[in-house]
Design a protein with these regions (language model features):
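Structured beta-strand/loop patches that form or line metal/cofactor-binding pockets in enzymes
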Residues: 1-28, 32
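Metal- or metallocofactor-binding catalytic centers and their adjacent structured scaffolds
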Residues: 20-98
Length: 100
């Protein structure tokens, strides 16, 4: 899977992420880091380059990105969690199964 589009919105203290793959399938994820939405936006911008590479395993991607960045803060974990949710949402939609 390759991510072709990354969108995000800050709603109060929540970051909502929508990732779209090369086939046009999109997935949603959310993360929360108190009221520091701008911090999560900056982190997502940093991770965008990594998300442009093919994704073979959501678990591998999460661990790879978590280890790559030394500032392992709650904000990083919130953004990675939102990305992880969105990727699993895409994978579930591709095989027409619910994501629970």
């Amino acid at each position: 899977m390759k991510i072709s589009k990354i969108e995000h919105w800050i709603v109060d203290k929540w970051m909502i992420i929508r990732l779209t793959n090369e086939n046009g399938v999109s997935g949603l994820g959310e993360g929360n880091f108190w009221s520091y939405g701008n911090v999560m936006t900056t982190i997502l911008d940093q991770l965008s380059e990594d998300l442009s590479n093919p994704i073979y395993s959501p678990d591998y991607l999460f661990n790879q990105l978590y280890r790559k960045y030394s500032f392992r803060s709650p904000a990083l974990t919130a953004v990675l969690s939102a990305i992880d949710m969105a990727i699993w949402d895409i994978k579930a939609k591709e095989v027409n199964l619910p994501l629970w």
